[in-house]
């Protein structure tokens, strides 16, 4: 435990596993109180226990990000308890089925955009005021290289990440002269997650980096000053 983020309140979506869990754990290890969100309470409790065992502090908030009312209620709860939010990590996402663009299933496409884009806008809208109350509000959004570099069969997921990047960067431009809020796009690169295993079922997981490496890169970046619109690409 160190105290680099002592007094900071952080919220991480998709915090029950993978990059989200690793990032939440790393932030807590630096002294932040971390609000953990995901759909499954049991998995969140395991991350919370690990944080407590390491001497950190956390609060779990099980919710479905596609339920805008749940997000609004969480924002009210954070306002009442802490009155600010210093770090918001938008990590939760779904991959969907990799397929040619003409073969994309319309219903799945709608679900994918609901989580990967619409829910992210609702998160930004719901926590904007709390981020502005921080003396150094930071909003991070996890993306993928396919958001900026089109790749065959990745059209649905790539389009959702391109939309997310644009949304976050527009928000950053809107608030940069009105507050201390700064936005960051994080491209984690090849990382050992359940989503990557689904996308690359034949890949040897030992050949790609652990989520903790991405989390450490995020923490180190948050210790520095940077302009809004910063892009962090985690190599390896």
Set out the residue ranges of the language-model regions.
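Catalytic Tyr-X3-Lys loop
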Residues: 102-121, 140, 164
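The beta1-alpha1 cofactor-binding region of Rossmann-like NAD(H)/NADP(H)-dependent oxidoreductases
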Residues: 42, 62-73, 106
């Amino acid at each position: 435990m160190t105290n680099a983020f002592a007094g900071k309140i952080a919220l991480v979506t998709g915090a029950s596993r993978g990059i989200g869990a690793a990032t939440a754990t790393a932030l807590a290890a630096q002294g932040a109180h971390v609000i953990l969100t995901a759909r499954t309470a049991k998995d969140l409790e395991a991350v919370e226990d690990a944080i407590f065992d390491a001497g950190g502090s956390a609060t779990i908030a099980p919710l479905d990000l596609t339920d805008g009312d749940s997000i609004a209620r969480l924002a009210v709860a954070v306002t009442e308890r802490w009155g600010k939010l210093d770090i918001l990590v938008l990590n939760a996402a779904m991959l969907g089925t990799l397929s040619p663009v003409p073969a994309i299933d319309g219903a799945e496409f709608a679900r994918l955009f609901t989580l990967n884009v619409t829910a992210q806008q609702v998160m930004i809208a719901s926590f904007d005021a709390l981020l502005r109350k921080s003396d150094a509000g930071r909003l991070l959004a996890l993306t993928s290289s396919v958001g900026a570099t089109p790749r065959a069969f990745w059209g649905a997921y790539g389009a959702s990440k391109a939309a997310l990047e644009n949304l976050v960067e527009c928000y950053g431009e809107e608030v940069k002269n009105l507050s201390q809020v700064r936005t960051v796009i994080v491209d984690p690169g090849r990382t050992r997650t359940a989503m990557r295993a689904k996308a690359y079922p034949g890949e040897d997981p030992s050949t790609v980096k652990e989520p903790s490496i991405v989390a450490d890169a995020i923490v180190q970046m948050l210790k520095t000053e940077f302009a809004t619109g910063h892009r962090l690409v985690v190599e390896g």
